[in-house]
Structure formats: structure tokens, C-alpha cells
Amino acid sequence: MFDIGVNLTSSQFVKDRDDVVTRALAAGVSGMLLTGTNLHESQQAQKLAQRYACCWSTAGVHPHDSSQWQSETEDAIVALARQPDVVAIGECGLDFNRNFSTPQEQERAFQAQLRIAAELQMPVFMHCRDAHARFLALLEPWLDKLPGAVLHCFTGTREEMQECIDRGLYIGITGWVCDERRGLELRELLPFIPAEKLLIETDAPYLLPRDLTPKPASRRNEPAHLAHILARVAHWRGEDPQWLAATTDANVKTLFGIAF
């Protein structure tokens, strides 16, 4: 199993990061993609990817941090992306839910990162919340120039999902789908994701699966819980968990070009 979304740079992991990685490996996780959400976090993620043989990282600026994007940021992201442990540009995209950066700042940073990914021929690791139409409008001109793209932590509608799949995007599914309050619609969409376009992730330390038992006292999510998410996704799709694990692993290798 490969976890395509781990925020291992989070302060929630500062005291036991080695143990978190050890527990993940013991739980059957064979690889992890560490998410970079701004320049500093991307640099830290790359250092952690160097430290742990089972980890790779992304380099990019999250829409929340898009106000930080400047020409110096771009130069630093490009330099970082040339490191062998960095296998995708992102986390980038649009988030019009809370607009921590203005829509204009988000669009500027997103388009710049799409251009970088195209120039470096690297896949993009993307985020979209309450911005689907504009997200696709900005992404569309770049699709034939990119080697691949994943929309991580998908929580949209069936129509939005189909529009993403029709454009060749991979779909990242998190423990959100295990939430009996807000994940039911996503759960119903699982069978409509082509197996060859499905990826799984924890988004740890966030999105602890609500149906996990026993729940950790800290309420912190970990990559070790990926097995639980995969088992639930396989159940709701009517597939064998081992087959789905092998299939999603193959998807990771295809999209990110890594061996694990």
C-alpha cells in the first residue's frame, strides 16, 4: 500500500516522527508521498524524504499560502523539484471556501505551478474546494502538456468527479469516506472511479477515519491507518482488498514514476 498524502512535516508529528514511520511500515504501508504546502514545508518534506527510504515528496504552494508566491518562490520550487526525492509539483490548486489567499493570488500561483510541472515534465498534486469550474478552466490548457495529475482528497459531486475522470485525472480518496455524517455521498461514488485512476491516502495527521476502532486518544491520524481506509474502500467498491492494494500501487508507479 502507498499513501499518496502524508503531512509528515506537521508539528503534530514532531515528537514521534520516527515511530510514525515505523508503525506505518509495520501496518503494511510500503511507501508515502510527503506533501509540501509552501516553500518551507516543501523543503522540510524533501529532507524527510531523504531521511526515510520509503518516502518521496512534493514541492509546491497550497492555495491557502498563495499570497506568498513570488518569483523567488518559483525559482526555489524549481530547484527543489530537481531533487530526486521530489516526484510531483504541489500541493497546488484553488480553495474558494475560506480564501486565506485571494482568488487572484490563488489563480496566479496555480497557473505558475502548472507551467513549472509542464516544463519539468512532472505530475501535479492538486487541491480543489468550492472552485470546481474555475479549477478545470485553469487546468484544461495544460492537460496535454502534463505527464499526469491527481486531485487529492476528493470530496465533490458525481458530476465533478466524472469531469475530472474524463480529463484523465487520478482521484485521491481519504478517510473522509469513512465519515457517516459527511462521507456518505462520496461513498456512493466509489464504484464509479475506474480502478486504474484510484489512489488512496490518509492526509495524516488530519481526517482520522471516524469508524476506526479503537480511536487513538490523540485523535491524530497516521499513515498506519491506510490499511483501514483501503479495506473500507474495497468493501464499498465490492473488490478484494489485496487486489485493490496492488492496483493502487501500480497507479502510483505509473503516475509518479517511482519504485517501492
Curated annotation (Swiss-Prot):
It is found in: Cytoplasm. It comes from the Bacteria. 3'-5' exonuclease that prefers single-stranded DNA and RNA. May play a role in the H(2)O(2)-induced DNA damage repair. Keywords: Cytoplasm, Exonuclease, Hydrolase, Magnesium, Metal-binding, Nuclease. GO terms for cellular component: cytoplasm. InterPro entries: DNase_TatD-rel_CS, Exonuc_TatD, Metal_Hydrolase, TatD-like, TatD-type_Hydrolase. This is 3'-5' ssDNA/RNA exonuclease TatD. It comes from Citrobacter koseri (strain ATCC BAA-895 / CDC 4225-83 / SGSC4696). Its cofactor is Mg(2+). CDD domains: TatD_DNAse. PROSITE patterns: TATD_3. The keyword Nuclease applies. GO terms for molecular function: 3'-5'-RNA exonuclease activity; magnesium ion binding; single-stranded DNA 3'-5' DNA exonuclease activity. Its main location: cytoplasm. Pfam families: TatD_DNase. Monomer. Belongs to the metallo-dependent hydrolases superfamily. TatD-type hydrolase family. TatD subfamily. Its EC number is 3.1.11.-, 3.1.13.-. A divalent metal cation binds at residues 91, 127, 152.
